[in-house]
Amino acid sequence: MIQFRKATLEDLPLLKQWDEDPSVIDSDPMGEWDWESELSKDPDWREFLIAEADGIPIGFVQIIDPQVEETHYWGDIGAGFRAIDIWIGSPAYRGRGLGTAMMKEALRRCFAPADVHTVLVDPLASNTGACRFYERLGFDFLEDRMFDDDACRVYAIARATWAQRHA
């Protein structure tokens, strides 16, 4: 069973270790997270979460409200959206269905507020495995888009699609 808990400064060594994993690097090559700084902040528009399986930390999830996120990464976007970043940190936990369980829990969390109508993800275009993963979960491809220097594929899942597939 997957459970989320808030990421804290105590998770710093683990997050830094995961950042060195080649699969994590491949999924976010420009992702130079300043963990010390980011973990000490707690803005209303973001959740940093550690995913645990049977009490063992296995991955990381970030959920943001892109309308109010401070860097405006998603550009000018309306209300009712959430965006997710997700990865499994340790190779030992990949390929076991845990990523699917993590994403389903993240989506449940995103759609808990009644005003959220759409969840976005932006895997690298070169990360075809991640693209297939999101498609299997019911995400629809929206567009190819450059985020900084990264060529990404933007996917979205609407509340109605999620409710139909995962209710």
Language model region names:
Residues 1-39, 58, 163-167:
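A short, well-structured alpha-helix characteristic of acyl/acetyltransferase catalytic modules
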Residues 36-93, 109, 159-160:
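Acetyl-CoA-dependent GNAT
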Residues 93, 97-106:
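Conserved acetyl-CoA pyrophosphate-binding loop and the N-cap/start of the following alpha-helix
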Residues 100-101, 125-143:
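Conserved active-site alpha-helix within GNAT-family acetyltransferase domains
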Residues 103-111, 135:
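A conserved short alpha-helix in the GNAT/GCN5 acetyltransferase fold that borders
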Residues 112-122:
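Conserved GNAT acetyl-CoA-binding A-motif
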Residues 120-131, 147-151, 160:
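Conserved beta-strand-loop-alpha-helix junction that forms the acyl-donor binding cleft
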